[in-house]
Amino acid sequence: MNASDTQLERTTVTEGDSQGIDSTASGTQNTRPAVIVAVLAAAGITSSLTQTLVIPLVGELPKLFSADPSVTAWAVTVTLLTGAVGMPILGKLADTYGKRRMLLLALIPLVIGSMICAIAPNIAVMIVGRALQGIATGMVPLGISLLHDVLPPERVGTAIALMSSSMGIGGALGLPISAAIIQYVSWRGLFWVDFAIAALIFVLIYVLIPKPHHEHNYAPFDFVGALGLAVALLCLLLGIIKGSSWGWTSPSILGLFIGTVIIAVAWGFWELRFTNPLVDLRIIRRHNVLITNIASIFVGFAMYAQSLILPQLMELPSSTGYGLGQTMLQMGLWMAPSGFAMMAVSSLGAKITTKYGAKTTLISGALIMACGYGLAALVMHSLIGLTIASCIGSMGTGFAFGAMPTLIMNGVPASEKASSNSFNTVMRSIGTSVSSAVIAAILAGTSIAVKGTSIPSVTGFRMGLLAGCAVAIVAGIIAAFNRK
């Protein structure tokens, strides 16, 4: 083992270092493990809700704020960008200063951002609020890492799977809840509800989640690395998200992608030389960690494609001959069971991981996702059929999302768990961004004109579903290269 690897395996006791279990056991005596899991899962659901609550509102924002749709679209885009940038930074700070502390810190911009959105007088203020909300995306990987610290070992696997699946519940519930609030209360009420939930979660974490006994491993923060990664991710994701609207061969998009490569290379050189890097590339290149991160990109693609295609198919007018004519609220209710299905299989996924290993669970999850897409492509005319297909796909997602953090955390030192898990979530976010661009291109490229309006064709929907199926299979193949 060389000197750098020796340094990586240092045994300084940090929050999350698990000398671990003895110290955390006393920390959980006053709080039942089930309560800890419930509170952190609720935090994960809240984070996911924040991402989806605004979706039913996107089409109304141009009218509400008298703004161009290209401007109001930033209410969604900016959340993805700040979330991707914030996750690795929060993860590294959590490894240094404490996961519980950073989890509470991540909730503060969510509370403030929700309030700003609720009172926003114009779209610029709304975008600022949404940017702050996006930082809370890092709560899920932080919560997963914290579970590893404060729970007895025999409960960790199931708890991580449940925490991972909380994203599915939030995504599934977000659409019907937001549609109902907009329809029966007001769009501002949507953000006041988010404000209240986030504030409540802050109090619950502060009161109920124990502090692990530890010594802080204070170290100089890698500001240069944080800035470099932030700029590289912003260039990459902005190029992917805006490629179709700005033009894939436009100077702006090409400049963003070229800038991504240049900045990423320079960032990599810096990270390999800094004593306490934001992302330790020596750890990231370890076999199982590297393979899992690559697989995460494909899993993220496959997970998100379903939520892009099925709602549009359900909401298209039945007069098209293939649309199912559902309202936003009805569509949300048809999609809601998939979130519960994802959570329901979390314990089964944990049992498979315990008995056969996280590699098997990840492969199984990816192949189950592929089956869901295959079924959806066959039953596009049926609401019940699509609901069943979405449930199958979400079950596979639940398996995969529960397995990936386990593979990552089993392959890194205790002092790097939060930052490595956060980086894995960033890889998944890149996959969802690519999915958004690819599916949008497929649907736009096969669109047809109906009464002067361009809409996705049935061929486009089927091609999108088959693309999701193929990507899920690729994710399973990549996962198979993990070592036991």
Residue ranges, per PLM feature:
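Paired small-residue
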Residues: 109, 113-116, 124-132, 384-392
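Helix-loop-helix hairpin linking two adjacent transmembrane segments in secondary transporters
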Residues: 169-203, 221-229, 236-257
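Conserved MFS/SLC helix-loop-helix module at the cytosolic interface between two early adjacent transmembrane helices
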Residues: 85-123
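Cytoplasmic helix-loop-helix junction between adjacent transmembrane helices
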Residues: 132-165
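Membrane-interface helix termini in secondary transporters
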Residues: 60, 88-92, 96, 180, ...
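C-terminal membrane-cytosol helix-exit motif in multi-pass small-molecule transporters
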Residues: 196-214, 230-242, 259-273, 476-482
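12-transmembrane solute porter fold
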Residues: 33-50, 54-55, 69, 73-78, ...
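Helix-breaking motifs and short loop linkers at transmembrane-helix boundaries and internal kinks
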Residues: 64-66, 98, 119-124, 152, ...
